[in-house]
């Protein structure tokens, strides 16, 4: 047998590592002089392009006074962000915000935790966290000091930034879920909410029933990228009609909500206007291959930067078998053999944006996550084994070599076959 025509099969070992962490990144090596104020803003996750929910993952803005002088322009403020690839947010949205706030001093602002679960910088969370971090510095100097003061009235801030050029397809709903009292609430996408221009008109759905019945987990892999992919937000259905079905399933929690997420994903991936990326096809096929009759997986939704999975309440912390089931199916569909790690994050409801104080941790859930690492095992083919007589054992009366008698096909035992093919005896 010619082994060169058959590449060795690749098997995998799966290693699961579970951990937990605080929802707010701690300051490490922060020895800068002077008082500092920290503002936090929750990131959000959407479901089926209809519902926006704040989650227990936060962007943090740490602000110090750089100069007591009134800035001549927004360019005087110093903005520090680790992700230099997104310098446009510093030059654009952040500068616009600092200009419109009409600040009385020059500040140094450090941004951390800016990436959401999709892996992208959340422009909304960054701006809201900055606003919250400036409040205690600026509020005593704000001469309006009335009920519409931008430092004490979230609706005034919302009205100022709602027309900014955010990348988000549902920017107003994301703003609402990030700024306002948002715990245990779903915010409507603005396509379903005509009153959203007025923040008092925000309509929400309670998420208490869904969160009591299910674990929602955001999953990504080393193959996912934060690059924006429009096909994941393509929607040819009537969004309002779909939203009516979503509302019904939220009010009466059962597995229909999870099944509706799968159907919505199927419609997204089936788009012919913009072909889905390889990682989208890989995860979609792999998740469908998981036998939901033998798994804790109830439903899933393909998203930008990853996918959501739905489990019965408590399964995430109690077991990890379902993680291995998902990992094994993704590996089976990975033609590139490039899948190395899969990251699982249990979603908990987030708190509203505010100025950070240490006692807030008492009211926050820990973040629970897990990583499945894939270790490749290359299975080598066995070397061919030759059977038969050696030259020393050949009989003295050797038969003539001409006109050999054809071998009877039925007479092919191990003792007289030329080679032993291990693959044929599996």
From Swiss-Prot:
SUPFAM superfamilies: GHMP Kinase, C-terminal domain, Ribosomal protein S5 domain 2-like
Organism, scientific name: Caenorhabditis briggsae
Protein name: XO lethal protein 1 homolog
Family: Belongs to the GHMP kinase family. Xol-1 subfamily.
Location of region: Disordered: 390-426
Biased composition (Basic and acidic residues): 405-415
């Amino acid at each position: 047998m010619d082994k060169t025509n058959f590449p060795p099969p690749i098997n995998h070992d799966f290693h699961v590592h579970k951990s937990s962490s605080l929802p707010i990144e701690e300051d490490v090596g922060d020895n800068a002089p002077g008082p500092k104020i920290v503002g936090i803003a929750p990131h959000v996750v959407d479901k089926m392009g209809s519902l926006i929910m704040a989650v227990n993952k936060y962007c943090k803005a740490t602000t110090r006074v750089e100069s007591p002088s009134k800035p001549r322009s927004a360019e005087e403020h110093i903005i520090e962000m680790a992700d230099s690839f997104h310098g446009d947010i510093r030059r654009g949205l952040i500068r616009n915000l600092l200009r419109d706030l009409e600040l009385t001093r020059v500040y140094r602002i450090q941004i951390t935790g800016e990436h959401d679960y999709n892996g992208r910088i959340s422009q909304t969370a960054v701006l809201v966290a900055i606003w919250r971090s400036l409040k205690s510095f600026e509020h005593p100097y704000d001469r309006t000091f009335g009920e519409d003061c931008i430092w004490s009235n979230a609706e005034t801030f919302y009205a100022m930034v709602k027309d900014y050029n955010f990348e988000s397809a549902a920017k107003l709903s994301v703003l609402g879920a990030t700024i306002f009292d948002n715990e245990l609430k779903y915010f409507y996408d603005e396509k379903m909410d005509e009153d959203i221009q007025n923040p008092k008109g925000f309509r929400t759905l309670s998420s208490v029933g869904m969160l009591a019945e299910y674990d929602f987990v955001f999953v990504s892999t080393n193959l996912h990228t934060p690059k924006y992919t429009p096909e994941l937000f393509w929607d040819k259905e009537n969004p309002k009609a779909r939203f009516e079905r979503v509302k019904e399933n939220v009010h009466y929690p059962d597995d229909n909500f999870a099944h509706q997420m799968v159907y919505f994903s199927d419609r997204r991936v089936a788009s012919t206007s913009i072909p889905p990326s390889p990682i989208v096809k890989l995860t979609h096929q792999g998740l469908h291959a998981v036998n939901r009759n033998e798994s804790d997986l109830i439903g899933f939704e393909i998203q930008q930067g990853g996918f959501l999975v739905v489990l019965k309440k408590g399964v995430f912390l109690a077991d990890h078998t379902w993680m291995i089931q998902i990992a094994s199916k993704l590996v089976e569909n990975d033609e590139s053999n490039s899948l190395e790690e899969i990251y699982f994050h249990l979603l908990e409801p987030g708190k509203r944006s505010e100025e950070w104080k240490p006692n807030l941790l008492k009211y926050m859930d820990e973040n629970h996550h897990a990583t499945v690492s894939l270790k490749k095992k290359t299975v080598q083919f066995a070397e061919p084994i030759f059977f038969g007589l050696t030259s020393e054992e050949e009989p003295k009366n050797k038969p003539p070599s001409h006109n050999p008698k054809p071998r009877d096909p039925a007479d092919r035992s191990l003792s007289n076959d030329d080679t032993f093919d291990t693959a044929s005896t599996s």
